[in-house]
Amino acid sequence: MSIVNLVPLTIGVFEGLHQIHAHILQTRFKSDTYILNTLLVMYTKCAHLVDARQLFNNMSRRDTFTWNMMLTGYAKNGHADEAFRIYEQMQQQGKRDVVSWTALIVGLVENGCGEEALEIFSQMQEDVRVMNALVSMYARCGSLDEAQQVFDNMDIKDVVSWNAMIVGYADHGQYAESFDDAQQLFDKMETKNVISWNTMIGGYAELGNSDQCGSMKDAQQVFDSMANRNVISWTAMIGGFSKDGDGEEAFSVFNQMQQEGIVPNTITFISILKLCASTAALLAGKRVHAIINQAGLQADISVGNALVDMYAKCGSIVDAQKVFDKMYERDVVSWNAIITGYAQHGLGEDALQLYNQMQQEGLSPDSTTFVGVLSACSHAGLVYEGLQLFNSMCHDYSIIPTVEHYGCMVDLLGRAGLLNAAEGFIRNMPFEADASIWAAFLGACRIHSNVKLADHAAKILLRTETQNAAVYVQLSNIYAAAGLWDDVEKVRNSMKDRGVKKEPGRTWIELGDQTHSFMIEDRSHPQSEKIYAELDRLGKLIQTAGYVPDTRFVVHDVDEKLKEIALCYHSEKLAIAFGIINMPSGTPIRIIKNLRVCTDCHTFTKFISKITGREIVARDSRRFHHFKNGLCSCGDFW
């Protein structure tokens, strides 16, 4: 047990404190300010002020905490004169702060020295630095009324005073009136510094496109009005545009920032890497990685973790592993990022190997780790291993399962066809299943064509998810595959009556420094004629190779030929054709889709990978699919 741990155990035990003190003086900790401060706390709490003062006098280095602790000890134990003397010494050395003032005032009041307390309080009000600290303390704690009261009563205010209030209101700007107050204060400021401007940018960026107040348009106006911007200003804009879903503008700001000679910091890089990850912009991510290396930040653990996450989410688990292997230091976040990456790519056994390696290296898994490994088991169909891990999480690590863990287990059992077991798992949960769990169960019903259970799950989902188009689409697909066209029509009418619109499928593909987007039957692209011609050519080749369109989930009761035509020009097919036209032979094609890839597009892509000899990596809303030589890494199980 360390000395720091031993000291608190001796509270109230005078001999124990003396023994610890004597031991400290014989070790390398005899000049350690933190250790000695801890001992000083114990002496003052036990009211051993003679020993506390002796320790205080013998300390070679004293910080503000040391002085405040000695002052507080005297004040709380009725030694107002000694407390005042310490206070005067602090004043001479510039050590006093809001804690010093408060401790002295409380001590004087408790000892019946009301006049002296009022005099000190008057002096305190004249010290703008201390009053600023008091405003800031209230604001950080969310006590905005108290902060405003202190602020209003200040005779002298500087830019720090105003900033403290603006930061307080902006930090609580999820409430419209709070951010309005921040804006009003900002407008009243005669002198603004970079902190003032950055606070407003950060507040607007956090709000995004809120209808209540604030937006990235407002943030841009504030940003454009700044005479001097620093790295925090630029980073706030990047983060705001990223959160707002405007990746193009975020990348533009990042590029402009560098052109103006502003060196990105760790937070900037993490923010832009998250954007690359969310948009699967692998080439952009690699360029950012190169800039990180030039800046000498590749050894930063937070940046390393963001790089692992970015590469995994961009479809390059190989690059993610390379970054992970080169990290000088790894924490549980590092391991979680690589484990989750392998899980998303359907490489369950690799994820489990990493999980075991993590433990061998002395790191304990946390709640997020288990979400990753349970998801890995689900994607890989490792039912037995998943059940073992769930039990281990509860019994070996005392981690209470969350809705995410239960969702993984329902997904695991459901994908494996154990639908009754999955439903039983839901019913035995210690809390009511939310929409995500019933959605996982509905997805399993689709995979295994269980109309009865799907109908049951959908009814439960639609009690709360009346505007969730995905539920209607899933149910409609299940009915269509079973040939229940009357039920398909009922679902369609229900969507129409409730004003629910299906999110249109969209697929993105990165080429050079540009990202190209496609929708179903999209003819807006400049290369549209070439893309459609290439798609027709590929269609003939794969039909010769044995491809048969999968029309089961076409939700229209029409002729089979019309169903096949409806499948021809899905967004992912257009993106793949574009990639084949524009990328050198043998180059992997990477696409990202906002929805789950349909069964026909999945089959189509397997055949394309075979006849072209290309690897095609597709990220949909569920997972990654690696198509190679006519096979998919998901094993047709998604």
Give a label for each model feature.
Residues 1-638:
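Terminal (and in a subset, N-terminal) low-complexity or junction segments at the ends
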